[in-house]
């Protein structure tokens, strides 16, 4: 690995995920803090996976996790890359159940590769199909320790039921009731609004029960 330039990342915390509803905004949540308690090195630039796959398979290096990548980016240690970089994490739909100590998160039945897409000096989260044929550009890491933290915090396996019900009610309101009323306001005959209101409210009450 003599050809790789490394930068050192000291322990610290970063934030991952979106606080927006994934189904409405296309960004997995919840937003959460990750505390990395170990020192590690990350490659100064992205590398073709095909060039380091042997070293990854031998355990000499590892592909960077999303948290490790983000902490290095937050500190200005990596910048102005090109295109899309693939990280080690894999998601199905959310971060629920993730252990928040910096290790990669592999969700059961995962179908999405967690990535970062460079846009000038900014890097935004991207989620590509796991079977994507995009050439994989990765950053590799060398960790001070390979032992997971047994006391690391973990997100709940699933979101609180009250939060889910509140989000579903908001989706029904935004995508169902409000558009119906707006359409009725300009197009419907008298009495249509009362019918739509009753129908939507009954449907929501039935689902809640």
Give residue ranges: language-model regions:
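A short glycine-rich, aromatic-capped structural motif
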Residues: 2-57
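Surface-exposed recognition segments
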Residues: 32, 84-188
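Short, flexible loop/turn elements at secondary-structure junctions
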Residues: 13, 40, 46, 67-68, ...
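Conserved hydrophobic ligand-interaction patch in extracellular adhesion modules
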Residues: 42-79, 83-86
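Membrane-interfacial hairpin junctions
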Residues: 186-198
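Activation segment
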Residues: 18, 51, 73, 94-95
């Amino acid at each position: 690995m003599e050809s790789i330039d490394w930068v050192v990342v000291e322990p610290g915390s970063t934030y991952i995920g979106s606080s927006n509803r994934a189904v409405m905004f296309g960004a997995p949540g919840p937003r959460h803090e990750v505390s990395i308690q170990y020192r590690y090195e990350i490659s100064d630039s992205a590398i073709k996976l095909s060039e380091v796959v042997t070293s990854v398979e031998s355990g000499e290096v590892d592909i960077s996790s999303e948290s490790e990548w983000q902490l290095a980016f937050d500190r200005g240690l990596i910048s102005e890359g090109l295109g899309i970089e693939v990280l080690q994490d894999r998601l199905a739909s959310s971060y629920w159940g993730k252990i928040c100590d910096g290790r990669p998160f592999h969700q059961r039945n995962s179908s999405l590769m967690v990535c970062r897409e460079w846009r000038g000096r900014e890097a935004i989260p991207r989620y590509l199909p796991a079977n994507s044929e995009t050439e994989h550009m990765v950053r590799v890491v060398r960790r001070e320790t390979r032992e997971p933290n047994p006391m690391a915090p973990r997100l709940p396996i699933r979101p609180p039921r009250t939060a889910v019900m509140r989000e579903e009610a908001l989706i029904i309101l935004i995508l169902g009731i409000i558009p119906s009323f707006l359409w009725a306001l300009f197009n419907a005959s008298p009495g249509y609004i009362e019918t739509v209101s009753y129908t939507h409210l009954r449907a929501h009450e039935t689902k809640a029960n």
